[in-house]
């Protein structure tokens, strides 16, 4: 024999909703309005859940928080829960914070292009150059990179000799002398350029 099953269904009157009809339209918060025939409030952009009493979860926006933010997360400070607009971190721009761009407080300055392998520092706007280059855009080759430093103390005045080479085969012999240690050195340079 078939077993009878009983179901209990509660039907709420208009403008009453929720578990056991315990909520009414006057309970909607943050400007939420009662939806006809639905058991929840119609929430304004940026609010969610039955009474519109919670903000959208991170990464969601719009009415009922049903839309997903499209901001590039690592370049973004905030995605607006109301309209999904992106507030970019310093050093980024674009409607999704997807482009390199402005840097500094409030994005006041434009980044100069870095050359010769330099990387733009998004916080300062300066180029972090490779060891062989210098200046704002890493365009000036550092001519002197020390490869050997020989210190000889044969007699006074002290003499320092450096054999120096650079990226472009500029060879230099430098002799520096000083009457006393730790005083300003007087230096003479001679160059031999080979290609």
From Swiss-Prot:
InterPro entries: MEGF10/SREC1/2-like (IPR042635). Gene3D superfamilies: Tie2 ligand-binding domain superfamily. GO terms for molecular function: scavenger receptor activity. Keywords: EGF-like domain. Residues 86-97 form the EGF-like domain. PANTHER family: SCAVENGER RECEPTOR CLASS F. This is Putative EGF-like and EMI domain-containing protein 1. It comes from Homo sapiens. The lineage of its organism: Eukaryota, Metazoa, Chordata, Craniata, Vertebrata. The gene is EGFEM1P.
